[in-house]
Each structure stands twice: as structure tokens, then as C-alpha cells.
Amino acid sequence: MNVAPPTSAPGERQRDPREAGLNVARIAFSPCPNDTFVFHALVHGLVPGAPRFEVTYADVDVTNTAAERGEYDLVKVSYAAVPWLLDRYQLLPCGGALGRGCGPLVLVRDPLPSIEGRHVAVPGERTTAYLLMRLWATNAPPARVSVVPFADIMPGVAAGHYDAGLVIHEARFTYHRHGLRALVDLGEWWESDTGLPIPLGAILARKDALDPVAATTWIKESIRQAWEHPDASRAYVLEHAQEMEPAVVDQHIALYVNAFTEDLGTDGYAAVDALLGRAYAAGLTPPVPDLAPMI
């Protein structure tokens, strides 16, 4: 298996293997099934012409912060974090998470009319989920927001530590088990309001480390192999699936790995422009340059 373990925790200074003249690149993405499914071939040396990758698995709030420091050559981040990163990184047109029917949820234990004046747990300050929630709740904001590890959000809401919790990914398949209900599906809200898919996670390539065109080619080949040979990545995906049931893993991949993962296309870029344009207009992010397709 051609995967090097991380040499240090995210946030610590990592030794750059290229300093020793090695053809190694640093990549970071989440242990979620959509990411491990997409990147399996790439990080296992199955993509011709690609370098060997040193892999870090981390939640997106961690990779958002690490990308600000330029720690990785190829990295999965929230689209909400992209405006702070484009001086160093290039947005790639593939490998990310964008689609319909896959948006974040605001969950509650007890019926609430809104989150106005409430205490809400969120997975990160620069996550797309939180940005969407802020846009949705512009006129009725919560009184308090706490950044909480994703795995602790649903248990915390169920225990009454928070009035509401903002969740993503597999939580949409499992929140009922915690006795919770959805106050709002932010993806449905976004799609109804804009007619566009919801941009969640982006793939960025560090401009001074990788050729973005080459990186795009590698990722597209990794996706092609994932779709053509899904059994090849099965053990790897399940290993990192955080005790997720196989049926939930399959639902997760089916929802988040789609045509937009292979190529953002016209609708994908329009969705990203709409999200970041609205965020800038609301004073929530810096402006971004034109994000026209790279290739």
C-alpha cells in the first residue's frame, strides 16, 4: 500500500519530504466515505504519472485551518473557506462535494420555530454549513454559537447541551436515532431560493507545489477507477468510515459522489459563484476573483 502515514498532527509543522529530494506530495481530506472513495486510487499509487502522496485524514474544519498555513499540496476544504485561500491555492474542477438533496441540516430535540436567540452547535466557523446557516438566519440569528467536534453535535443536542445543531454528511441518515428532528434542510432552502446545487467541499491545489492541470487529471482518473472498480476501495473506505454501517456508507457515497465530483461544469461554477457572491454581499467573506473553469 503506497500511503505514508502523517508525520505530525494537523497544525504542527510537518517535515516536507521534498526537502530530501523525494517525489512526494502532501494531501489532506476527511475520512468520510465520499473522500476515501474518490481518492483511493490516487493515494494508493494506482494513477499513472501521479506522485506518491503523504496522507492526512482530518475533519474539514481542521483542513480549512491547515490550508490557511499552506500545509498541504492538495487539500479538501469547505467552499466557505475558499475566499481566504486563493492567493496560495487553485480551485480544481473535480473531486469535491456538490449536488442536490445533500445540504446541511439544522437539528433540534424539541420543536422550535427558529434558532433566533438560541444556542447552536456548529462544526466550524468557516464551513459551508455554517455559512449557509448564517445566510438563512440573517434576520433571526442565534444568540450563541459553539464550535463542536462533528461527532459530538448530535449527542449534545439530544442531551440538551445545545438548542440546535448544524450537521452534514452521514448525519442526514442517522439523526432520527438520536431522537432529533430537522428544523430546516439548508440544501432544500438553497435549491429553492437559487435553483442551483449546493457547493459543500472544494479541492484545492497549492500553486507553487503542483501543476493544477496535472492534479485535475490525476483526480479524474482516480474517480474513474472508483466508479469502474468500487470493490477495490471497499476495505479502505470501511476502515476510515468511523464505525459507520455499510448501508450508510453506500448511501453516503451515492449522494455525495456524483457528476459534479467528476467536473463542476456550468451549473457547479454558477453555484459556487452564487454562494460566495452572496456571502461577500452579506459581509461574511472577502471578495473572490472570477472562478471561471480552469480547463
Can you name each region flagged by the protein language model?
Residues 59-61, 70-83, 149-150, 167-173:
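Beta->alpha turn/N-cap motifs
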Residues 91-112, 191-207:
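Hydrophobic/proline-rich hinge and linker segments of small-molecule sensing/allosteric domains
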Residues 148-239:
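Pocket-lining segment of extracytoplasmic ligand-binding domains
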